[in-house]
Amino acid sequence: ACAAVHRPQRVNEEERSFIVKIIRTKDYADMSRKAANIISAQVIMKPDCVLGLATGGTPVGIYEKLVERYNEGDLDFSEVTSVNLDEYRGLPKEHPESYWSFMHRNLFDHVNIDPAHINLPDGTNMDAEAECKRYDEVIRSVGGVDLQLLGIGHDGHIGFNEPHDAFALGTHCVDLAQETIEAN
């Protein structure tokens, strides 16, 4: 199996700084709450922000918290743009195992995000190079990512970038380890 993966490109430091902050939490619920706090603050401070969103088991609790806050009237996603991290090649977006479906089930169908502002790699485009270029252009056209949510897999993979992969910039395809396929 192969997945299209976007790795944010470094931009001029005057334009954007990249900060990685490790926050220790006592458990999954605490992590979900704290991560939702960070995302909520970003949406409130910059209503037209670009969120880089992840899939898999890690963010489900985060998305539940964001939906709760939306339902309570605390968050407005109407101006938010999303650029998702990855998608399985060969799966149409309507397939229940696609990450398009995952994101709709867990977040998009429950908040007021504009469907025109939802971006994921196209898993049905079998011209991998063209799809990677197209998705990089989408990300450039929205001004880059303001906040990127990532999960770390049980084997250390991040956004389908396996531990042994070279850290290339931009959207690219990777071959997934069997363990990653089974876990996802």
Q: Predicted segments — roles?
A:
Residues 8-19:
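Short, Lys/Arg-enriched N-terminal segments with co-localized hydrophobic residues
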Residues 18-51, 129:
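N-terminal glycine-/serine-/threonine-rich phosphate-binding loop
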Residues 45-71:
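Glycine-rich N-terminal segment of FAD-binding domains in flavoprotein oxidoreductases
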Residues 49, 57-62, 138-163:
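A glycine-rich beta-strand to alpha-helix segment
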Residues 75-148:
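Ligand-binding beta-strand-loop-alpha-helix segment within the catalytic cores
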Residues 159-184:
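Class I SAM-dependent methyltransferase SAM-binding "motif I" and its flanking Rossmann-like core
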